[in-house]
Amino acid sequence: MSEPKTGRGALFTGGLAAILASACCLGPLVLIALGFSGAWIGNLAVLEPYRPIFIGVALVALFFAWRRIYRQAAACKPGEVCAIPQVRATYKLIFWIVAALVLVALGFPYVMPFFY
C-alpha cells in the first residue's frame, strides 16, 4: 500500500532552498551576531553564483506545495490524511509560515545594506 502524499516534502524543499539562496547574505550577519570572525564568514561568498538556482528551486517547491495543499478535497480518498479538516488547516498554516520565511529570506539581500 502506498503512503498518502502530502505537501511536507515540497514545503521542506522550498524552505531549504530559500535558506541556501540567502546564505551568502543572511549567513554572515547571523554568524557575526553569534561571534564568529569575519575571515571565516568570507567563505560563504562561494554560494553567491548559485543564488538564482536556489531561488528557482524555492519558488518551484512552494508552487508544488501550494498545489498539493490547496487541491480539491474531492481528490482525497476518505481516510487519507489530506481529507481530515484539522490536518488540512495545519498544513495551510505551515505553508503560509514557510512562504513568509521564504519571502523574507529572498528579500534579505536587498535590505541587508541597512544592517551594515
Curated annotation (Swiss-Prot):
Effect of C25Y: Abolishes mercury resistance
Disruption phenotype: Merp-merT deletion mutant is unable to transport mercury into the cytoplasm and shows almost complete loss of the resistance phenotype.
Membrane topology: Multi-pass membrane protein
Subcellular location: Cell inner membrane
UniProt-reported outcome of changing C24R: Abolishes mercury resistance
InterPro entries (UniProt xref): Transprt_MerT
Record Gene3D superfamilies: bacterial mercury transporter, merf
UniProt GO cellular component terms: plasma membrane
Result, substituting G14R: Abolishes mercury resistance
Bilayer-spanning residue ranges: 16-36, 44-64, 94-114
Domain of life: Bacteria
Record-listed Hg(2+) binding positions: C24, C25, C76, C82
Keywords: Cell inner membrane, Cell membrane, Membrane, Mercuric resistance, Mercury, Metal-binding, Plasmid, Transmembrane, Transmembrane helix, Transport, Transposable element
NCBIfam families listed in its UniProt record: PRK13751.2
Known function: Involved in mercury resistance. Probably transfers a mercuric ion from the periplasmic Hg(2+)-binding protein MerP to the cytoplasmic mercuric reductase MerA.
Quaternary structure note: Interacts with MerA.
Protein family (similarity comment): Belongs to the MerT family.
Protein's UniProt name: Mercuric transport protein MerT
Organism expressing this protein natively: Pseudomonas aeruginosa
